[in-house]
Amino acid sequence: MTVVELPRPGRPRAVPFPDQAEAVERLVRHLHRPGTRGLFVSATGTGKTLVSIRVADGLGARLVLFVVPTLDLAAQTALAWRRDDHLEHMVIVSSLDAGGRDDLVAARVMSTTNPHALGGLMSVVGQGQDQIPALTVICTYDSLDKIEQTQRSGYEVPPFDLAVMDEAHRIAGRADKKWAIVNDAQRIRAHRRLY
């Protein structure tokens, strides 16, 4: 049996360290204008995920794409968002079956590789009565083609408010690398990109 610590009403969110708070403030200021890209460099284990979550908050992002290199990081990232009191709809796009992991089931994290299912979900993000207020999509670099297919699925899928690329050094280099499609605004549509 797996025990997962989920957000509880009244539980305080993590307080960023001063360097994290400064990074969030600077990144939000930089990324405020649609069409911008930003680079955040920090050592392993220094809280880059928390900074990214708080940047999304600071931008008021309702539709977020968070791209990671591995299945373990996909699960870890989903749980980090939940621990930071993010209760919005959340889906992992990869070969990971969230239904087969007790921690992800308890955290109410879905998974799919079906562009039409994801497109249906993404198309109802908004403030209307029949809409969901926010959606976080966590995707592995290997599954980026599913995001591209979703955005071309025929649903009225808006661009992501923010796309975050974890371990971005993996997408550097030649533009024709499979994972580099996340840099191409014609293939993966996002108003802002954070590397």
Residue ranges and their predicted role:
Residues 92-121, 140-146, 170-171:
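Conserved helicase motor
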Residues 33-56:
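Walker A/P-loop
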Residues 142-143, 153-195:
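SF2 helicase catalytic motif II
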Residues 54, 58-98, 141-143:
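Conserved Walker A/P-loop ATP-binding site and its immediately adjacent core
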Residues 58-59, 85, 128-131, 154-157, ...:
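Conserved catalytic network of the ASCE P-loop NTPase/AAA+ motor domain
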Residues 119-159:
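Conserved helix/coil segment N-terminal to the catalytic DExD/H
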Residues 33-39, 61-62, 134-135:
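Pre-Walker A (Motif I) flank of P-loop NTPase domains
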Residues 2-41:
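Conserved pre-motif I regulatory segment
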